[in-house]
Amino acid sequence: MKTLLLTGATGFLGGAVLEKLLIENQSVNYLLLVRADNAQQGLARIRANMEKFNIDANLLSKITIENILLGDLSEPADFLTDARINNVTHVINCAAVASFGNNPLIWKVNVEGTLAFAERMAQVPGLKRFLHVGTAMSCSPEPGSLVAESGEFEEDAEHLVEYTRSKSTIEQLMRQRCPQMPLTIARPSIVVGHTRLGCQPSSSIFWVFGMALMLRKFMCSLQDNIDVIPADYCADALVMLMNSETLENDVYHISAGEESSVSFAEIDNAMAAALEKAPVGDEYAQVTYDALVKMRRQLKDIFGPCNERLMLKAMRLYGSFAMLNVRFSNEKILKLGMPKPPRFTDYIAGCVQSTRGLSIQQQMVVDFK
């Protein structure tokens, strides 16, 4: 039987992985890394997150305090001496500070703490796979391109945010410092929503689309494409990578790819249909960031009470990503047997429904923690 050390199970993607494993009743001994003062509190945090996924109480009862590994990747020395780690056969490392803000913990957790964790796991004799969750955006893609997986590291690459720089750096450091570790890197594209639950588990990034359409202007064109996948599809792929006996490659995109990426015009139409409104369509204008800054005093009229400075920062960051117009090749994961991903527009109605009544300001908090 596998012994899985799963990090990030109190978050969106890690929660989706645990959801899949519990629903499918997979034969796994769980060891869940959780930040908490004690094991009971850690268990409560896991259960609270899993309730967002509508997990049945009977399934959830399979997770007990024996499955809790108290610890924090910002202080890895506190948990790396736990004897249970020596029995781990598989790791899925979803934990990260995935903030697009200037969180001081980004480097401490995503690079320093994760490296210490990897170096400890590299010493475990029975470890069969260390599946590290990176991000497809860590490669600083060329605008307008279809990006293939590459393990090459560009030290002087330009990154839009510190988060993607940290994810690129840790991949390289783990390869250098843990050459014998059975490392596989999964790079999801942009994870938004859940095919069955919409944004109930997390509103991360979905609010950006609503913000742009409420503004009726943004930095990208409606003809630009964006590579979006739902959390449950990403979790399916991660579990498949964990369970595969042999893997031909060490880096896999989990992405919509060329075929399932969608244009902003398609998103506009799908959101309008879900809201039973007319799409923005021809009233949309592609503008520069400076033009958005000039609208600063209008933001409260458009969005209601909001932090204008934070809204403008969000527009600059997400507008820059949207303008990249990139898709990430998913041929390798499809070749392994993953089904084609759903298109964002196939499940966007559930995202709209699950965020009704929530302001943009309320929805965006998760991404600027």
Regions found by a protein language model. Name each.
Residues 1-90, 94, 369:
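N-terminal Rossmann/SDR dinucleotide-binding element
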